[in-house]
């Protein structure tokens, strides 16, 4: 295998870090961002600390770990991980999860794994988010590999094949776990579905038939449950803008606002629930099925694991009853919890500034974001 084919997309190797650190330290835009993120420490001290990091994990423990736990302490009401379904802590897995937050889904997962004596994950990140050169360098220091997006069909096929080979190499040869979202972009309505395109990409690398190739990846579904999504009002706003403006697309500024709101908005309780590896289930699938049916069966297997492992909060039940005009779950939440959630939804609605604001649509979209995980959870647990 020619490892140089991965040079453009892979995380930096540890021996490359000194040069990259010097490039970052010399970049005024990075200096400004670093002093904003860690305001109480002079930049020269941060630079000195960076230079002492010999590995990517050293860097993550020196900088990212503390920052992420600070975010968790200030902007959540508790951050937890249950990894008991995968007792072998030395094995490399591909964690495929529902996608709620651009930065924190993978960031929180890594610090939780470290606290349970495991390594951090490599992260698939779209190049559309790498809007400045220093960001692209920093994410590659932080164990990210790059998903190339704005390409022609032919380029996309080549890029996907290369990324798949890289991921197979990472699991099999580096024994390094990976996190990847089940779909491109976040599910704006929290109706989480694994995209066939993600599985097709994973099956481009490796050896054997489609099932063998996916088994090589040791896929472990991961359910991420945020009690509150601080970006919910931005997602609702986007629904109306897409309805009202033909061809509406988010700007780079919108992406930055979503990242900032996701990082520093209140999330309530946040729980990560790992399900067992799906290799045994893959063995049960009829390999002679047409490919579309095979991918549909595998996607459904991952989705069901995620749905069953969601953690439900009072707001999910309140949203379901409110949306459907029922009292089906009044035994599960108190009047106080109901009033708290109703107040939260109205508060989020109030943050939306938009021409011809359609409150009925926006409220419905907000409620769906909290009801859909429960709807899918109930269906999966029947």
PLM regions and their residue ranges:
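Phenylalanine-focused residue identity feature
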Residues: 6, 12, 21, 30, ...
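Short, highly charged low-complexity linear segments
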Residues: 166-168, 333-346, 365-372
